[in-house]
């Protein structure tokens, strides 16, 4: 199987794109609830309400739709966060809003962690790409903020991965596991850590 052939099958018609979206949405539920080994193409098509043969118009295999789903969820997450931080007056405000947005997204899309975590073992390259795309854009945003004098200069590559790691685990604890803390409270505590650090006299 050509692991990178999914893009060749992206439909050009509105109807085709809608059907593909239905399949991806169904796959998210199927993989999230049953895991990759137990998930089946038949169940995905049943959830999507399409014929089994329709699946192969868009995807070659279960692995291919899984890979497409990981990429799709990354795009949705970045779009969701991007829209909510776009009007931020400075980088530190964007960091706080980004945490809020990510936790809100996970609370509304609980299969996110399950699917992305599975990718590490099912399709490691897709797993790496998922986070690498995030980190690359994050690093560039931090560099621009440093150039604009909004934050101090530093190792933006390391910072981007550190901030992503922090946010991912915040999402796991306060969105996937439970919702006992408010989004605003979590983001405020995170923002204080990012802006002031942990030093006593910071």
Q: What spans do the regions from the language model cover?
A:
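C-terminal peripheral helix-coil segments that are non-catalytic and often amphipathic
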Residues: 1-10, 104-108, 136-147, 166, ...
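Generic hydrophobic, amphipathic alpha-helix propensity
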Residues: 19-28, 44, 65, 69-77, ...
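Helix-turn-helix
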Residues: 22, 30-64, 68
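Short coil/turn segments at alpha/beta junctions that flank glycine-rich nucleotide-binding fingerprints
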Residues: 33-37, 88, 109, 148
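Short helix-capping/turn signature of helix-turn-helix
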Residues: 59, 118-122
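Hydrophobic alpha-helical connector segments
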Residues: 68, 79-108, 159-163, 184-187
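Amphipathic alpha-helical packing segments from all-alpha helical-bundle domains
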Residues: 75-78, 124-148, 157-161, 169
